[in-house]
Amino acid sequence: MNLFIKIINKYLYKLIYNFIDFYQKIISPILPARCRYYPTCSNYGKQALAWHGVLNGSLLLLKRISRCHPLGGHGVDFVPLPLASYRYQYLSCNPVAHGQFHGFYVYRDNHGYVTRLNHMMKLT
C-alpha cells in the first residue's frame, strides 16, 4: 500500500510540475505579465511542490492562485519552509554551569532554519 501511494505521488508530482512547466514555456510568453506577487505563481508552485510534496504543495499553490487577483494582495510572498522536518533540541541557558562545555567551541548548525533554507534553494 505504501509503495502504491509513493507511485501515485510521483506520478502526480510529475503531472503538476510538467503542467506548470508547459504554462511557463508556452502559455505565459503569449499573455501579458499578470502575477501580482514575487516569485511568480508558477515559480511558487514549483518550489512548493519540491519542498512540501504533492498534497501540501498543491494546496499552497491553490491558496496562492486564489489570492492573485486585482482585489487580492501583492508583493513578496515566498514559499514557507517545511518546518515539520526539523529536529529540535533544548539547550540550557547556562551550559558551563552544568559542565557541558569548557573553552571555546564553534557550533556548526546542520539542521537549523538557515541551513535548511540554503539546502532547499540548491534543490530548486
Swiss-Prot record:
Membrane topology according to the record: Peripheral membrane protein
Disulfide bonds: none
Source superkingdom: Bacteria
InterPro entries linked: Membr_insert_effic_factor_YidD
Major site of localization recorded for this protein: membrane
Keywords, comma-separated and alphabetical: Cell inner membrane, Cell membrane, Membrane
Any single Pfam family the record assigns to this protein: YidD
Coiled-coil stretches noted in the UniProt entry, renumbered to this chain: none
Compartment annotation: Cell inner membrane
Gene Ontology cellular-component terms listed: plasma membrane
Function per UniProt: Could be involved in insertion of integral membrane proteins into the membrane.
Family per record: Belongs to the UPF0161 family.
PANTHER family membership: MEMBRANE PROTEIN INSERTION EFFICIENCY FACTOR-RELATED
The protein, known as: Putative membrane protein insertion efficiency factor
